[in-house]
């Protein structure tokens, strides 16, 4: 049977070995942040939007490039008044590492200039390492359904 010409291509379900998306990484990370009882928020800047929604968000003050995670609880290490994380997909699973945009680079630099620790995390494990190095007390036991963002393409 031929596929209907009126339907778009079917999306294939992601296999367990496929690369986690930035959204997958963020969903896993937020559980650690909540468990640590930190004052934090996620920004809703990612994703594609229609022109009308994008224009409305811009009019409301949404800025391009703001990091994905903003932690207002000062890092216990004493480095920075807060911590900003830009989450990117790690390299692996046949996919290239996520790229930092020019707007994102500017935000990271500006946050550092006002005393924030601002980092790019390539995957969940990298994000947890950054948070741990900042002195945050995280429960590092894997959560149920934890994503695996370590994969070697060799």
Segments the model singles out, each with a brief description of its role:
Residues 1-154:
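Catalytic phosphate/metal-binding cores of nucleic-acid and nucleotide-processing enzymes, i.e., regions
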């Amino acid at each position: 049977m031929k596929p209907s010409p009126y339907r778009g291509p079917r999306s294939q379900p992601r296999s367990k070995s496929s690369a986690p998306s930035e959204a997958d990484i963020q969903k896993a990370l937020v559980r650690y942040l909540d468990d640590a009882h930190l004052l934090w928020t996620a920004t809703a800047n990612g994703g594609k939007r229609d022109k009308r929604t994008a224009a409305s968000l811009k009019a409301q003050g949404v800025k391009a490039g703001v990091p994905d995670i903003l932690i207002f609880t000062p890092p216990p290490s004493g480095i920075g008044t807060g911590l900003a994380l830009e989450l990117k997909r790690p390299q692996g699973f046949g996919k290239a590492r996520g790229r930092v945009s020019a707007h994102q680079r500017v935000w990271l630099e500006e946050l550092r200039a006002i005393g924030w620790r601002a980092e790019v995390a390539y995957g969940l494990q990298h994000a947890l390492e950054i948070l741990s190095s900042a002195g945050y007390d995280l429960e590092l036991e894997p959560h149920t359904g934890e994503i695996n963002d370590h994969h070697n393409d060799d």
